[in-house]
């Protein structure tokens, strides 16, 4: 018998893709490469109506394109070798580097442009790797040239290249012409192969193209190597760099020596430290005899220069310091004295002209800088508005810029500390020279550079921008965060503290002063926008003084009680001891009334006992019964307190600790008041940005200590809350309970009817009622338990009921039984969770 012939397996080409290509009817295994690339990069072939395949032989990529592209698509394949015809594919023989191929493509394409250009060509390899790789890169560049001429805007170019030194140059060229360039290696490509595929998407289609970009001589030009980086070798000696480019021609030695004095006199010491292995000392050298006496010339130094390749950074620095000291000793680093150039003094006109030119140049640079900043701000705002990030705020910022160069600025007055004087006086609108010199914003030095003034304006502008950005940030956060909205609502609803009784007389005087001040200001010639702002701020400040002398909302609610209707608003400035005692009695009386309301007789007696005091408590001008009104109001207040006491909940460990301390008597009310006075109580937040104040609130509070018992109490409370059933379970239980109650009510009605029936005896009534009770209390029918019997051993092939099995049964094999047990175990596990 003859030997069975077997096809040669060249480098593993007869793999699974070879047999898959045979089964699918493709001409080569490379068809799966383009299939995998197409799937990875968004199925670009399915969207392409015109496809060009360069170096297409034997035509496997054209077959894939004809299968994946839409119907009636134009597919053109070209190669230097002839190909068999394929359905729905135009093929012709030509060299892609010639003009003949370019003209034939134009003839087939007419006015169309290609959506995708494919290139899977490779030269005949076998000479030398450097030559083969360069030929492949040259072929890829020619394919790119054809693609640039025929691709549509946004088209795709897929090409094969070899990994070589020209790879980065080609990638750079691709990146100039396409928006997205990625290198990939599909699974169908063998690992031993040096080929990789580059996918270039979104062709830019430039109107003007530099011809050097597609010229092989320009693209693959050999550039001279730059100077070798010896600093990395000296200052990072631990990092070894391989000589991937080989060694210099003619230099076949790895060991080099030179003289120490040559190193000292060299202008490039770093390079010599990186190149040489040893520095030789010539004892007869005159310079060495001089520098030998240096204190840096130690035994350690002489040992280091014996072998430079084993030194570290510290040793190299020591050698460089020795070289510097030696050069200073020998006078090699002395600079030559430059001849002094006599400066001719400028005349007065020339000096004025020079200063004028300097000022004009500074002014031009300042205007240019401001213009650039405004353009940058507008660009940022346009981008933000396009992304729907914020509302346009340019109008407000530009409006704020209008009054910046005004004569009078109230912000400046506030910085100088004269705002209080302005508020007190009526016609003071001009600052003194001494006061003007306090702040740099008002006192402008004529000799000061323009940059200082610009910096102040920039600071004000930046502050206004930050405030606007912070307000926009709060608006955006409140839109998307419900907790932040609730926090803002709580902060806005907080009531002000009581600051005392209002003084009507002082308020009227302040109003008159404000009115006179405003009238005088209206008659003045200052009608700028800053003056209006100043007036508004002054009026606001005066009104704030009025508000500070008035009652807060809580105080008004307290003193609106009928008990205080007769109290005179004007209190004496200095009260005697009897007055204070009477006030104390009133407080004690009201406290007792809150705790235990007194009868009307006792209240009248208490009031009559206080007639001798100077302080009039209540003036009963009305004929109504005060006691009944007081009792009703006390009851309403008590019910309101009881209602709100239910809402009080101790939810934090700190609150629980404080509650424990108050309950056990470790702390009193006085202690809590004392704790309220701390370093954060009177922190000055005036004239600070809002965003800074909000951020400081998180840190401007005392961390109060907590106890283990309080933490355990909160933990138990949370555990009890978490132990409650979910809403769905609670609703189901409630429905079940409701149905049970309804059935019980129905049973009661039926039992009542049976009991009212006089025709029946007591025994019959009892039996019927017991029958009804049994119907209500009967348990649900339980499903009969099914016994599982394994069909193995004596039960294998058994027909009929197995021995010893009662009730329902089920014959199963071992696998099914294990599966059933596993399902039960999983269901039980989930039920526990």
Curated annotation (Swiss-Prot):
User: What keywords appear on the UniProt entry?
Assistant: Coiled coil, Methyltransferase, Nucleus, Ribosome biogenesis, rRNA processing, S-adenosyl-L-methionine, Transferase
Catalytic residues as annotated in Swiss-Prot or TrEMBL: 160 (proton acceptor)
Give the Gene Ontology MF terms in alphabetical order: rRNA (guanosine-2'-O-)-methyltransferase activity; rRNA (uridine-2'-O-)-methyltransferase activity
Q: Give the enzyme class.
A: transferase
Ranges of Basic and acidic residues composition bias in the record = 477-493, 635-645
Question: Binding positions for S-adenosyl-L-methionine?
Answer: 59, 61, 79, 95, 120
Under what name is this protein listed? Answer: AdoMet-dependent rRNA methyltransferase SPB1
**Species in which this protein is naturally found:** Kluyveromyces lactis (strain ATCC 8585 / CBS 2359 / DSM 70799 / NBRC 1267 / NRRL Y-1140 / WM37) (Yeast)
């Amino acid at each position: 018998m003859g030997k069975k012939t077997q096809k040669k397996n060249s480098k593993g080409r007869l793999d699974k893709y070879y047999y898959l290509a045979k089964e699918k009817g493709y001409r080569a295994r490379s068809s799966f490469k383009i299939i995998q690339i197409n799937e990875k990069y968004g199925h670009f072939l399915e969207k392409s109506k015109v496809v060009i395949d360069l170096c297409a032989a034997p035509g496997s990529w054209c077959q894939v394109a004809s299968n994946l592209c839409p119907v009636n698509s134009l597919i053109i394949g070209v190669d230097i070798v002839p190909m068999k015809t394929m359905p729905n594919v135009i093929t012709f023989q030509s060299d892609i580097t010639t003009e003949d191929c370019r003209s034939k493509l134009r003839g087939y394409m007419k006015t169309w442009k290609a959506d995708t250009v494919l290139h899977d060509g490779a030269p005949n390899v076998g000479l030398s790797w450097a030559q083969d790789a360069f030929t492949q890169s040259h072929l890829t560049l020619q394919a790119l040239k054809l693609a640039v001429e025929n691709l549509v805007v946004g088209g795709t170019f897929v090409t094969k290249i070899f990994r070589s030194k020209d790879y980065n140059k080609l990638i750079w060229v691709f990146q100039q012409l396409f928006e997205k360039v990625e290198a990939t290696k599909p699974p169908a490509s063998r690992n031993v192969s040096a080929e990789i595929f580059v996918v270039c998407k979104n062709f830019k289609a430039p109107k003007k193209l530099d011809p050097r970009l597609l010229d092989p001589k320009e693209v693959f030009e050999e550039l001279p190597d730059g100077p070798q980086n010896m600093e990395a070798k000296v200052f990072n000696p631990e990092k070894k760099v391989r000589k991937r480019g080989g060694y210099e021609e003619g230099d076949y030695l790895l060991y080099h020596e030179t003289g120490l004095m040559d190193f000292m006199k060299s202008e490039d010491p770093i390079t010599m430290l990186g190149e040489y292995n040893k520095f030789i000392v010539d004892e007869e050298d005159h310079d060495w005899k001089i520098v030998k006496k240096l204190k840096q010339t130690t035994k350690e130094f002489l040992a280091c220069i014996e072998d430079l390749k084993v030194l570290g950074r510290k040793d190299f620095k020591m050698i460089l310091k020795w070289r510097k000291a030696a050069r200073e000793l020998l006078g090699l680093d002395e600079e030559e004295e430059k001849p002094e150039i006599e400066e001719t003094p400028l005349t007065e006109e020339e000096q004025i002209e020079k200063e004028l030119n300097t000022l004009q140049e500074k002014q031009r640079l300042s205007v240019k800088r401001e213009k650039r900043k405004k353009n940058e701000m507008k660009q940022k705002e346009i981008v933000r508005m396009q992304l729907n990030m914020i509302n346009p705020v340019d109008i407000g910022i530009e409006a704020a810029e209008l009054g910046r160069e005004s004569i009078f600025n109230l912000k400046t007055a506030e910085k100088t500390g004269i705002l209080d004087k302005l508020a007190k006086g009526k016609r003071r609108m001009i600052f003194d020279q001494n006061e003007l010199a306090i702040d740099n914003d008002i006192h402008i030095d004529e000799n000061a550079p323009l940059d200082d003034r610009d910096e102040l304006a920039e600071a004000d502008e930046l502050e206004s921008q930050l405030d606007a950005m912070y307000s926009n940030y709060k608006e955006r956060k409140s839109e998307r965060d419900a907790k932040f909205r609730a926090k803002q609502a709580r902060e806005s609803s907080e009531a002000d503290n009581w600051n005392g009784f209002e003084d009507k007389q002082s308020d009227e005087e302040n109003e008159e002063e404000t009115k006179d001040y405003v009238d005088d200001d209206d008659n003045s010639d200052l009608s700028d926008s800053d003056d209006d702002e100043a007036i508004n701020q002054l009026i606001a400040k005066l009104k704030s003084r009025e508000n500070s002398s008035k009652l807060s909302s809580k105080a008004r609610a307290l003193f609106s009680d009928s008990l205080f209707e007769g109290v005179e608003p004007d209190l004496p400035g200095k009260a005697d001891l009897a007055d204070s005692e009477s006030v104390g009695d009133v407080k004690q009386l009201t406290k007792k009334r809150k705790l235990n309301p007194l009868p009307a007789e006792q209240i009248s007696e208490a009031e009559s006992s206080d007639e001798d005091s100077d302080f009039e408590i209540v003036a009963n001008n009305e004929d109504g019964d005060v006691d009944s009104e007081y009792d009703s109001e006390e009851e309403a207040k008590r019910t309101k307190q009881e209602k709100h006491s239910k809402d009080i909940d101790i939810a934090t460990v700190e609150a629980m600790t404080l509650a424990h301390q108050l309950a056990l008597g470790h702390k009193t009310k006085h202690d809590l008041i004392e704790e309220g006075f701390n370093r954060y109580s009177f922190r000055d937040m005036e004239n600070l940005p809002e965003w800074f104040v909000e951020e400081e609130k998180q840190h401007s509070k005392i961390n109060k200590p907590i106890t283990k018992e309080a933490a355990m109490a909160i933990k138990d409370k949370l555990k009890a809350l978490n132990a409650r059933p979910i809403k769905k379970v609670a609703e189901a239980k409630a429905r079940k309970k409701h149905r049970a109650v309804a059935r019980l009510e129905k049973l009661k009605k039926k039992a009542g009817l049976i009991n009212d029936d006089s025709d029946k005896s007591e025994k019959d009534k009892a039996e019927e009622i017991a029958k009804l009770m049994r119907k209500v209390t009967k348990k649900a029918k339980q499903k009969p338990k099914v016994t599982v019997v394994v069909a193995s051993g004596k039960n294998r092939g058994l027909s009929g009921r197995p021995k010893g099995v009662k009730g329902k049964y089920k014959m199963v094999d071992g696998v099914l039984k294990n599966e059933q047990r596993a399902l039960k175990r999983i269901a039980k596990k989930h039920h526990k969770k």
